[in-house]
Curated annotation (Swiss-Prot):
Name of the featured protein: Protein lin-52 homolog
Naturally occurring in which organism (per UniProt): Oncorhynchus mykiss (Rainbow trout)
Alphabetized InterPro entries for the sequence: DREAM_LIN52
Subunit (UniProt): Component of the DREAM complex.
Protein role: May be involved in retinal development.
Length: 112
């Protein structure tokens, strides 16, 4: 078994401080546009502060994310299908209400 100090030496020997810039698109073509910019923005992947997208989440939102993360693939697909069906039903209901508003002339601009 390795000693704790030996483990630190081993980990530090694995670190690479080499910078690979994309100065030459011929040598380093960017496979996915924007990935290099994103990687540059993530200078330290291990931070104590939450990411920007989590800053505005409430505890209910985080619980929902945890619940969705614990679902199996089949259950998650079923949840997505249910959300798509709900969105479709809401679209139909909105269409009916807009048609109703058109027939009642409540959506027309007042004539001057």
């Amino acid at each position: 078994m390795a000693s704790p100090n030996g483990g630190d030496d081993f980990e530090s020997s694995l670190l690479s401080f080499e910078k690979l810039d994309r100065a030459s698109p011929d040598l380093w073509p960017e496979q996915l546009p924007g990935v290099a910019d994103f990687a540059a923005s993530c200078k330290n992947p291990i931070t104590n502060s939450p990411p920007k997208w989590m800053a505005e989440l409430e505890s209910e939102d985080i619980e929902m994310l945890k619940k969705l993360g614990s679902l199996t693939t089949a259950n998650l697909m079923e949840k997505v299908k249910g959300l798509q069906n709900l969105a479709y039903q809401l679209g139909l209901e909105e269409s009916r209400e807009m048609t109703r508003g058109k027939f009642l002339n409540i959506l027309e601009r007042p004539k001057k």
